[in-house]
Amino acid sequence: MSIIGSFPPGGPRVEVQETRVQTDRVLTIPNILSMARLAGVPLFLWLILRPEFGGPQSDGWALLVLALSGVSDYLDGKLARRWNQISSLGRLLDPAADRLYILSTLVGLTWREILPLWLTLVLLAREAMLLVMVGILRRHGYPPPQVNFLGKAATFNLMYAFPLLLLSDGSGWIASLAAVFGWAFAGWGTTLYWWAGVLYVVQVRRLVRADVAAD
């Protein structure tokens, strides 16, 4: 749910995205789905890089792992909310899996020269910026920012873009069509990814300024 954090008169009002923890259990169905999604990261990276090391083409299997990851990403959040199984572990696993899939896909597609290096660096720079913000929040006693709608929308766009771009690494009309839609999703995803990152920076700045003013 979305809550508004109020500060002393004259202070900023910061919108914070928060999901209330409803259980301390670890072995819930949503958490198991998130763990399975995390376990798929090295498998996906191995499948996508096999051709680069003399192995057979495994793009079909890599696409399947990515598709299953997307399905589990949708299900773990939906089931956690429906069954009141939102947990502290789940709140860590879900964004961790998202970021690891994005990172592994960036590595694989850049290594195979499907993605240009500049785009990979742009996306990694956003991640580095967010890590700095998390460090600042921790120093002031705040938890890491929760994933908001904009950040989730950016992730979904990128997770649509990457399999389409992988599919475009071929010939024929299907590859050409995949390239068009893949780059469209990549453009939107990168824009939203940075937009969400800038909003995090603005929120962190306001929180820190409010902290300093309170002292």
UniProtKB/Swiss-Prot annotation:
One record GO biological process: cardiolipin biosynthetic process
EC number: 2.7.8.41
Activity across pH: Optimum pH is 7.5.
Cofactor(s), names only, from the UniProt record: a divalent metal cation
Deletion phenotype: Inviable. Knockdown of the enzyme leads to lower cellular cardiolipin levels, higher phosphatidylglycerol levels, and increases the distance that hypha grow before changing direction and branch.
Subcellular location: Cell membrane
GO cellular component assignments: plasma membrane
Cofactor note: Highest activity found with Co(2+) whereas Mn(2+) supports a lower activity; no activity detected with Ni(2+), Ca(2+) or Mg(2+).
Record membrane topology: Multi-pass membrane protein
Pfam family membership, one: CDP-OH_P_transf
Organism superkingdom: Bacteria
Xref: InterPro entries: CDP-alcohol_PTase-I, CDP-OH_P_trans, CDP-OH_PTrfase_TM_dom, CDP_ALCOHOL_P_TRANSF_CS, Phosphatidylglycerol_P_synth
Keywords: Cell membrane, Lipid biosynthesis, Lipid metabolism, Membrane, Phospholipid biosynthesis, Phospholipid metabolism, Transferase, Transmembrane, Transmembrane helix
Gene Ontology molecular function: cardiolipin synthase (CMP-forming); CDP-diacylglycerol-glycerol-3-phosphate 3-phosphatidyltransferase activity
Catalytic activity of the protein: a CDP-1,2-diacyl-sn-glycerol + a 1,2-diacyl-sn-glycero-3-phospho-(1'-sn-glycerol) = a cardiolipin + CMP + H(+)
Segments passing through the bilayer: 29-49, 60-80, 117-137, 158-178, 179-199
PROSITE patterns linked to this entry: CDP_ALCOHOL_P_TRANSF
Enzyme class: transferase
Main location: membrane
Role summary: Catalyzes the synthesis of cardiolipin (CL) (diphosphatidylglycerol) by specifically transferring a phosphatidyl group from CDP-diacylglycerol to phosphatidylglycerol (PG).
Similarity annotation: Belongs to the CDP-alcohol phosphatidyltransferase class-I family.
Name of the protein described by the UniProt record: Cardiolipin synthase (CMP-forming)
Provenance organism: Streptomyces coelicolor (strain ATCC BAA-471 / A3(2) / M145)
